[in-house]
Amino acid sequence: MNVPQIVKDANKKSDYIVFWLSVIICITIIIATVSLGFIAALYAAHEIDENGFSQFESFFTQNIIFLLTGIAGFMLLLVSIRIMRQTYLGNALQVEYSDCVWLRNWSNKVAKDLEMPEVEIMVTQDPVMNAFAFGFMKPYTIVLNSGLIRYATDDELKAIIVHEMAHIKYGHTKMGTYSSIFRFMPGLGSVFSWILDFWGRRSEFTADRLALAYLKSKEQVKRALVCVHIGPDMAKSFNDLAQQWQVYKTDSSFNRFSQTFSSHPFLVLRLQRIDNSNLINDTLPKISESNDKNNTKTEDVKYGSDS
C-alpha cells in the first residue's frame, strides 16, 4: 500500500538534510577538538603534570573519559526511555481505562489512515498544558498532561494527537533519541544541542503541517497551538490583530537569532506558517473514510469534524 499522499505533501526532504548536516557538524567539531588537543599534546609531550603523566598521556586519558562518558550517557538514555514507559504504565492513566477512551479510538484511526503503528496514550498528573511523544521502537507513547485534558476542547485534543503522531510517523522521536548522544558530550553538549535544535524546530513545523493536512482546518490546528502555549483563557484575547503585531515585533535579525536558543519555533511564526500554507486545497486527495465502516467509534472521533 502506498504511503498516503498527505504524508508526502506535509513532509520535506530538507528536514532530513538539515538533520544529517547537524550531525555531520557535531562530528566535525568533535574531530577538530580532538585533533587540536592531539597537536597541543604533541608540542607539550615533554611536560609533566602534577600526577607524573606527560601532557600526551593526559590528553589520551581525558579523551577516553570524554568518549566513555558520552557513550554511557547515550546508553543510559536508551534504557531510561524504556524505564520511562514502564514508569508511566505504573503511575499514569492509559486513556482506554478512562472517560477519554475516545482519544484511543481517534489515535487508532489516525494510525490506520497514516499507515503507522498504533500508539499508547497516557495521562499524567501535571497542571501544565503540554503533550509529548517518545520512543525509538514500538510501542511508541504519547503523554498528555492532565491540564491539557481538563482545559482543551475535543477538537484541540484531536489536533494535538495528530501533531504528536506526526513526530512518530516521520521518525522525529527516533532521530532525536539517537542524536542525543551529542547532547551528553561533556563540555560540548550545550553547543551540540544548539546545533541540533535547528532540525528540532523544523520538525515542529512539519508536525504542524501534517496535522493541518489531515484535519483540513487551519483554525483547529491554530487553536490547539494557542491553547497549549498561552492557555484557554488568554487564547480568547490572542486575535488576528495581536498575532500580526507579535509577528511584526519578532521579525528582526536579533529576534530570529534569539529563536535559535529555543527548542521550538515561536508561536506566532507557527501560526503564520499555518495561515500561509497551501496544503488545504481542492486538489489534495482526502483520506478514504471507508476505514470507518468496520470501526465502532463515537461521533466524537469522526475525521475532519471541523472542516
Per-range role (PLM):
Residues 1-128, 288-307:
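Hydrophobic or amphipathic, alpha-helical segments that drive membrane association/targeting
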Residues 97-118, 193-250, 279-282, 287-292:
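Short helix/loop segments within enzyme catalytic domains
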Residues 113, 128-153:
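Active-site scaffold of zinc-dependent metalloenzymes
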Residues 143, 153-170:
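Short alpha-helix carrying the canonical HExxH Zn2+-binding catalytic motif
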Residues 165-181, 218-219:
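Catalytic Zn2+-binding segment of zinc metalloproteases
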Residues 177-196:
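Hydrophobic, aromatic-rich membrane-embedded alpha-helical segments
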Residues 244-307:
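Pan-zinc metallopeptidase signature
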